[in-house]
Every structure is written in structure tokens, then in C-alpha cells.
Regions:
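Basic, helix-initiating cap at the start of DNA-binding domains
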Residues: 1-16, 20-32, 54
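Secondary-structure edge/capping motif, primarily at the C-terminal ends of alpha-helices
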Residues: 87, 128, 152-160
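Hydrophobic alpha-helical segments that form the core
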Residues: 100, 135-155, 167-176
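C-terminal peripheral helix-coil segments that are non-catalytic and often amphipathic
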Residues: 123, 161-180
Length: 180
């Protein structure tokens, strides 16, 4: 039901605008009460971001599972390249991404959720055996990786989804790769 409710909400947001769509509108369109809506999502914004924490945990687990001795930047590149399509396919198609980019409240929520995701990934990077990464370095690498994903996503949106997102991610990671 969460997935169906999220899809319905997105359709209403696109049709009416985010600000002009209420929780009552979403609930009514789904045949639910407002109270029932809140059993599935704590807020209107969370309809678009409901699975981010679970996804963040899975990405962090993938970081921990990478081969010992692999350079931290290579770990982030490999994991985020692999997960990039799943991260966006989870709930964010082009309509959702455009809605988020054009709605200040949703952009703020996205940044809040991304902060949590970056924290989980940074922690996972530090916890890898033999890395010896300090918090500052892990946070910096993770923030740069997030910037690479953001830039790749924006470029993909600028070209109406016709570019290969994986290639954009590779390009961004190559451009931001730490020097020797």
C-alpha cells in the first residue's frame, strides 16, 4: 500500500502542484482517511522519501562488503555506480526528481535525508578493516561522492533522461578523484 500511495501522491503533486495537494487529497484519492495516511507516512514530504533510510543502510552494507585494501574513493565509486539506478528507481523517476528540484520544501527534505545517508555511508567507510580513515576524511570523501551523484542526476535531468546515468556517474567520479 505504501508504494501505491506514493505513486498516487506523486501523480497528484505533478497534476496539482506540491503546495496545492493536501494530505486529505491524497488520502481521499486512495480511499483512505487522513488518519490512515499517517499510518503509512509521517508527513506529506515523506511520501516521496519513505524508503531512504532502508536504502541508506543497504548502501552502507555494500560499502562494508567491498574487498579489503580497496581505496576508499574506489569503494564509493563502485558501490554508488552499482546502486545509482536502484537509488533513483526506488521512487524517483523523472517527474519526481523535477518536482523535488522545483519545490523548496522537498529540496530541503531531500538534503536532510541525504545528510543521514551520507552519515551512514561515511561511518561504513571508516568501519572497513584496515582503512584507518579519520572522520574528516571519510566525511569529505562521502560528501564528494554525493556531489558526483547530484551532478550526474542534474545532467541527466537537463537532457530529459536520455544520457546514460552510469556513464555520468563515472565521469563525475573521475573528475573528482583524489590526486596521488
Amino acid at each position: 500500500m505504501r508504494t501505491e500511495l506514493a505513486e498516487l501522491a506523486l501523480a497528484l503533486f505533478v497534476e496539482r502542484g506540491y503546495e496545492d495537494t493536501t494530505v486529505e487529497d491524497i488520502a481521499a484519492a486512495a480511499g483512505l482517511s487522513k488518519r490512515s495516511f499517517f499510518r503509512y507516512f509521517p508527513s506529506k514530504e515523506d511520501v516521496l522519501f519513505g524508503d531512504v533510510e532502508d536504502l541508506a543502510d543497504r548502501v552502507a552494507d555494500a560499502v562494508r562488503a567491498r574487498p579489503a585494501g580497496e581505496e576508499p574513493w574506489a569503494v564509493l565509486h563502485a558501490v554508488l555506480r552499482e546502486w545509482e539506478a536502484r537509488i533513483h528507481a526506488a521512487q524517483w523517476d523523472m517527474a519526481a526528481l523535477r518536482l523535488i528540484e522545483s519545490t523548496p520544501a522537498l529540496r530541503a527534505r531531500l538534503h536532510q535525508r541525504r545528510d543521514g545517508m551520507r552519515d551512514r555511508i561515511s561511518t561504513a567507510l571508516r568501519e572497513r578493516p584496515g582503512t584507518g580513515l579519520d572522520t574528516f576524511t571519510a566525511d569529505l570523501l562521502t560528501a564528494c561522492a554525493a556531489a558526483a551523484i547530484d551532478a550526474a542526476t542534474r545532467e541527466w535531468l537537463r537532457h530529459d533522461g536520455t544520457d546514460d546515468r552510469g556513464e555520468l556517474v563515472d565521469r563525475a567520479f573521475t573528475m573528482l578523484a583524489p590526486g596521488p
